[in-house]
Regions:
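N-terminal Rossmann-like FAD-binding beta1-loop-alpha1 element of flavoenzymes
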Residues: 9-36
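Central helical "cap/lid" subdomain
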Residues: 40-46, 237, 243, 247-307, ...
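Helical element adjacent to the flavin cofactor pocket in flavoenzyme catalytic cores
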Residues: 156-168, 187-265
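Dinucleotide-binding Rossmann-like beta1-alpha1 core, especially the glycine-rich loop
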Residues: 50-177
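Glycine-rich FAD pyrophosphate-binding loop
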Residues: 29-49
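Short beta-strand to alpha-helix junction loop
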Residues: 111-124, 147-157, 198-218, 227, ...
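Active-site lid/adjacent beta-loop-alpha segment flanking the redox-cofactor pocket in flavoenzymes
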Residues: 109-112, 129, 133-137, 284-289, ...
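C-terminal catalytic lobe of FAD-dependent flavoproteins
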Residues: 172, 202, 314-315, 339, ...
Length: 453
């Protein structure tokens, strides 16, 4: 709760994914007035809709490492590659790529991992507190996360990664093939191909969409206002601060409807990949670029044979999580702009790869038939808001009254609860208790209701 030094504010949150809703919850919990704007008819209908479902504090290494540049070049012409760079005539893409390359060294990798792990641990604790206080059910499984390898070279490299992550307090351990199959017997049919693996018992999984929507309902019940189905037209800047935001309802009908203005003491941009272009309109330039990810949700034919431990398949860099009577499988990143199509040749190849791989790993367990084969897999794509470091931007921008909570990449679900809590603390004039480089903490701009350092 806010204490005496923290004056209550009216805040407007732009975006109703896991980051935006978590922010709204924690702001409301502290007594701040909250209005959330989102273009969709409900919460969590874009990037938070059908992700890999993992709360992956322990498996959080940045994409940028010393091997990434050569791998990216090798994969450029492979439609099924884990990381596919699709060059565009887009200066933002190339600028982002150059910044990414600058992070592809051991020093930057360790520096980035340290912050990502710190935010992950803080966020996991915040999620547990949220679940305990709200009782939200979201197909949560606290069985840890396993990661299996199918070649000796990758398994050997995993041992080095285990040692590195232990430096930062991550209790990941190397396991033999036999031990891995004891942890998750569902992979026995594929066991001959598995070299070994790693395992962390503290990680978990659950449905991000269900959780986010339930948390949004509880926010509304506690007085938060929601403007669903509304587009953000522009941020209105007067002097060196944001004065208001202009929004308009999407279903305006033939007669049309004029936009209207919302004023507040603070504006929080949590629009995922769309945060960067919106922020640039008022002179805030953050390197957030969309990474197109894919998922498939398969009905279970043999529930007793489906994995209960959320697992990463290193061979294809995909993750799978049991969500009740379905298996969610997700992975691959495609850097090619804001394209959301599922019917392009590349998109179809990547979706069909998910079907083929699960049929290979878990034969007969799921209905993995493609639509062309008469099946009904729920293929989906979402844009992961990627930064070159994999570290999100959380805090106050150099424009007055304008805050940002975006750039979480593939870890939005993992970092969601803590990012929202941290944002509420920052807006209330406090510094969250973790080793993380928040925006504007050293000299935050004076805003009504906050304390300057």
């Amino acid at each position: 709760q806010c204490v005496a030094h923290c004056a209550l504010m009216k805040t407007i949150g732009l975006g109703a994914g896991i980051i935006g809703i978590s922010t709204a919850w924690h702001l409301r919990d502290r007594g701040h007035e909250v209005v959330v704007v989102d273009r969709q008819p409900d919460a969590a209908l874009e990037t938070s809709f059908a992700n890999a479902a993992q709360i992956s504090v322990s498996y959080c290494e940045p994409w940028a490492n010393r091997e990434a540049p050569l791998k990216a070049l090798k994969w450029m012409f492979d439609k099924e590659a884990p990381l596919l760079f699709r060059p565009q005539l887009d200066w933002d893409q190339w600028r982002w790529g150059l910044k990414f390359l600058a992070q592809c060294n051991d020093t930057a990798f360790e520096r980035n991992v340290q912050q990502i792990v710190a935010l992950g641990a803080y966020s996991h604790a915040a999620l547990k507190d949220l679940v305990a206080s709200t009782g939200i059910e979201y197909n949560r499984l606290e069985r840890g996360i396993a990661h299996f390898y199918t070649d000796q070279k990758s398994f050997d490299a995993a041992g080095h990664a285990v040692e590195l992550m232990r430096k930062f307090g991550v209790q990941r351990r190397l396991v033999s093939r036999d031990e891995l199959l004891k942890i998750e017997p569902a992979f026995k049919a594929y066991g001959d191909k598995i070299t070994g693996g790693t395992y962390t018992s503290t990680d978990e999984s659950g449905d991000a969409r269900v959780f986010t929507q339930e948390l949004a309902r509880r926010c509304a019940a506690r007085g938060a206002q929601f403007l669903y189905g509304h587009d953000v037209l522009r941020l209105n800047k007067i002097g060196d601060a944001i004065d208001s935001v202009a929004v308009i309802a999407r279903n305006t009908g033939a007669g049309g409807q004029k936009d209207f203005i919302l004023k507040a003491d603070a504006f929080v941009v949590a629009c995922g990949s769309y945060s960067a272009p919106l922020l640039r309109t008022v002179g805030v330039d953050l390197p957030i670029y969309p990474g197109k990810g894919y998922s498939a949700t398969f009905p279970l034919l043999k529930p007793e044979g489906a994995p209960m431990v959320s697992t990463i398949d290193d061979g294809k860099k995909i993750a799978m999580s049991r969500l009740g009577n379905v298996l969610r499988v997700a992975g691959t990143i495609e850097l090619g702009g804001f394209d959301m199509s599922l019917d392009s040749p590349v998109a179809r190849a990547r979706c069909h790869m998910l079907s083929r791989r699960i049929a290979e790993i878990l034969p007969g367990v799921c209905d993995t038939r493609t639509p062309e084969e008469g099946g009904n897999p729920q293929y989906w794509t979402g844009l992961r808001p990627a930064t070159p470091t994999n570290i999100p931007f959380i805090g106050q921008t150099r424009v007055g009254k304008l805050w940002v909570n975006a750039g979480h990449g593939t870890l939005g679900w993992t970092h969601g609860a803590g990012s929202g809590k941290a944002m509420a603390e920052l807006l209330s004039g406090e510094v969250p208790a973790m080793n993380f480089g928040f925006l504007g903490v050293q000299a935050p701009r004076a805003v009504r209701g906050t304390v300057t350092a």
